[in-house]
């Protein structure tokens, strides 16, 4: 008998021990990400052919202490490789792990390859050739700290490749993981099984193969053990023939049925093709449909729903997933009372949206991604309680939901009267729900303020999930129109940095002016909502005047001035992107011509050198900036007098500067302004719109004129 290592994923060791025991192995012992055991050739052939959980089987030829490359080389040369395979065989070395001395797996693989080749050449035999793509044998090496395991892969490529799947959906499960999920679900193979988000059908096919007793390795064309000197082809043919007969008989005996539902017709066709190649197509019914509306099949008593819903790398990028899990959970309770469910996801927060209590839960990895599998018993429910399911969802966060309702009734009506289709609905009104929510027509932008360090991450995630669910429910908005961002304390121009490349813009209306916003690609959208009253006022002041807009951003103030009848406009910003955006905003409102100038420049430098004069100047500088493109830092509190000194030179005798900034507790240096011959009037309270009335320090705004 030889000693073997069955390789599997972390967390599946004990499940694999059970499987190997059923295959006739009596001494299986779990180790990290694997199981060790002894087996005859017949037993290992059977294990390779029948294991649904192992990714490979390795014949162990040596285990040794390995501190450095010399230990690795000497221990490898001590193996009599000539006894294992002929020199004509092509090899590749799969080296896994590093330690203090062997820091590179490629280097480790090279040392093992050199040692094996030297074993043959020292016996005056031809040297085996190395071929990554055409290898007959894979030499397997595991190195962890000072412990090394050296062996021969009995399989070759991973056992997850069953042969039935030539293409998959967007996020396919490995077949070995799918089999583990089926086994962990507690499914009784005599009961029907439904996957309402089946994708390419892997879960269903693996379950159907179990029910039909089809060996998962039957379709594999090449095995590593076939290249070994002790390979027994007749014995292997017998083991394989026996499995083939069992599979053909098994399909005919299966009485249970399998149901697959997916909302992508192309992927469903792939699933059907995969099932046909696996030999189980007659056992599975595939249907186009929505998981959130899935109906219970006939004769589904005591059946089980098993699925791997989408979960995304980051919860925040997929608010739609929260709505999906919420609706799916409600549908499970409405349609599948008395049945079981097993759901696999990387996100415990998304699983909580199902609003079901798990009977059991397991931790599994999908590749490197830690995941949860939760098993549920779905209680029988009375019909009238099911009909109320949707309205009960807002009770997850009742205080928050009620505040949203109250705000929308007040602010929504005001916005409609004012001719606004974008406004702030909620701004951390309740401390425990620390977000800002802005409405842009039929879209929501939820900005999460970074949670304090003393709030546990899991608690913050769960609360954010509740916020998104309640907002979708109360405001009746399509979950795909919800955008989530995390807002932290800004440094310099970080609020203008690009977050994505979706380029999904939309056109909004503000007091009759049309503007373009982008909810996806930047932290800010291209429009500061707190300045809507300021912009309207600029439009009212601009008739027949030469208008200057500094730190112009996307030029929304320029558009209001132009639409208000400005004789000319000059828009200055350092960003080429935002100036192009400003031009698009102007063109959208029919404001084109030479009287409208756009200048890409450092506003402070431009201001110091400018000679033209203006009747109306709007300047809304950053609180602080240290942009690499600026020659010096800027602090609005420190530098506002210098700013006014330069602005005074450009201001005509009867002109007005509208000066705004976002620094909390900003103090205007009235004495310095008076010395410059300027008057300043604080109009902050006049420019604060209703949707920002709870945040009176969102900005401060001043009218500055020459002294008479």
UniProtKB/Swiss-Prot annotation:
EC identifiers of the protein: 2.1.1.173, 2.1.1.264
PROSITE patterns to which the protein is assigned, alphabetical: THUMP, UPF0020
Catalytic reactions of this protein: guanosine(2445) in 23S rRNA + S-adenosyl-L-methionine = N(2)-methylguanosine(2445) in 23S rRNA + S-adenosyl-L-homocysteine + H(+); guanosine(2069) in 23S rRNA + S-adenosyl-L-methionine = N(2)-methylguanosine(2069) in 23S rRNA + S-adenosyl-L-homocysteine + H(+)
Organism domain of life: Bacteria
The protein's enzyme class: transferase
Protein name as catalogued: Ribosomal RNA large subunit methyltransferase K/L
Keyword Chloroplast: no
Keyword line: Cytoplasm, Methyltransferase, RNA-binding, rRNA processing, S-adenosyl-L-methionine, Transferase
CC annotations in GO: cytoplasm
Gene Ontology MF: a single term: RNA binding
């Amino acid at each position: 008998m030889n000693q073997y290592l069955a390789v599997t994923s972390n967390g599946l060791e004990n499940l694999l021990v059970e499987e190997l025991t059923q295959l006739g192995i009596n001494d299986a012992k779990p180790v990290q990400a694997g199981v060790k055991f002894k087996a005859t050739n017949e037993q290992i052939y059977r294990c390779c052919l029948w294991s649904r959980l192992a990714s490979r089987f390795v014949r162990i030829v040596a285990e040794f202490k390995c501190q450095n490359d010399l230990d690795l080389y000497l221990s490898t040369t001590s193996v009599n490789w000539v006894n294992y395979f002929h020199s004509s065989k092509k090899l590749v070395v799969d080296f896994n792990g590093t330690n203090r001395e062997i820091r590179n797996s490629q280097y480790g693989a090279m040392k093992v390859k050199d040692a094996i080749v030297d074993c043959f050449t020292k016996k005056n035999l031809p040297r085996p050739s190395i071929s990554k793509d055409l290898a007959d044998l894979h030499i397997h090496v595991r190195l962890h700290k000072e412990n090394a395991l050296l062996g021969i892969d009995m399989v070759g490529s991973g056992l997850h490749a069953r042969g039935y799947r030539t293409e998959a959906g967007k996020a396919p499960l490995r077949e070995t993981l799918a089999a583990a999920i089926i086994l962990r679900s507690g499914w009784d193979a005599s009961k029907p099984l439904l996957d309402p988000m089946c994708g390419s059908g892997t879960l269903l096919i693996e379950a159907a193969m179990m029910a039909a007793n089809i060996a998962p390795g039957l379709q594999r064309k090449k095995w590593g053990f076939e290249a070994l000197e002790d390979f027994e082809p007749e014995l292997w043919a017998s083991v394989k023939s026996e499995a083939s007969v069992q599979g053909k008989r098994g399909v005919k005996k299966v009485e249970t049925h399998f149901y697959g539902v997916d909302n992508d017709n192309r992927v469903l066709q792939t699933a059907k093709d995969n099932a046909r190649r696996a030999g189980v197509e007659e056992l599975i019914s595939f249907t186009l449909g929505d998981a959130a509306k899935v109906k219970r099949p006939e004769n589904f008593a005591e059946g089980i729903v098993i699925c791997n819903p989408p979960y995304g790398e980051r919860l925040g990028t997929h608010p739609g997933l929260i709505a999906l899990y919420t609706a799916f959970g409600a549908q499970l309770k409405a349609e599948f009372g008395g049945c079981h469910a097993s759901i696999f996801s990387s996100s415990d927060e998304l699983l909580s949206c199902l609003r079901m209590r798990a009977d059991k839960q397991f931790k599994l990895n999908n590749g490197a991604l830690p995941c949860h599998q939760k098993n549920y018993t779905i209680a029988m429910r009375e019909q009238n309680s099911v009909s109320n399911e949707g309205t009960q969802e807002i009770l997850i966060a009742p205080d928050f939901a009620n505040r949203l309702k109250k705000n929308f009734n007040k602010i929504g009506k005001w916005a409609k009267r004012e001719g606004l289709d974008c406004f702030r609905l909620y701004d951390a009104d309740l401390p425990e729900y620390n977000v800002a929510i802005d409405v842009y027509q039929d879209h929501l932008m939820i900005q999460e303020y970074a949670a304090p360090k003393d709030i546990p991450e899991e608690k913050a995630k769960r609360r954010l999930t509740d916020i998104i669910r309640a907002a979708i429910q109360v405001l009746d908005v399509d979950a795909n129109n919800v955008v989530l961002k995390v807002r932290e304390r800004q440094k310099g121009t970080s609020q203008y940095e690009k977050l994505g490349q979706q380029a999904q813009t939309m056109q909004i209306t503000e007091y009759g002016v049309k503007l373009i916003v982008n909810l996806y690609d930047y932290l800010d959208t291209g429009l500061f909502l707190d300045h809507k009253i300021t912009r309207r006022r600029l439009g009212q002041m601009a008739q027949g005047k030469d208008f200057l807009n500094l730190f112009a951003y996307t030029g929304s103030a320029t558009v209001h001035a132009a639409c208000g009848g400005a004789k000319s406009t000059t828009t200055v910003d350092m960003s080429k992107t935002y100036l192009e955006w400003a031009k698009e905003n102007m063109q959208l409102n029919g404001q084109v011509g030479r009287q409208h100038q756009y200048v890409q420049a450092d506003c402070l430098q431009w201001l110091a050198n400018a000679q033209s004069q203006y009747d109306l100047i709007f300047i809304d500088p950053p609180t602080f900036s240290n942009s690499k493109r600026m020659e010096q830092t800027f602090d609005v509190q420190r530098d506002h007098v210098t700013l006014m000194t330069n602005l005074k030179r450009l201001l005509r005798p009867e002109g007005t500067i509208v000066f705004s900034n976002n620094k909390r507790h900003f103090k205007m240096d009235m004495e310095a302004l008076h010395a410059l011959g300027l008057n300043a009037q604080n109009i902050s309270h006049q420019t604060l719109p209703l949707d920002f009335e709870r945040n009176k320090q969102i900005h401060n705004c001043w009218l500055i004129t020459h002294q008479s």
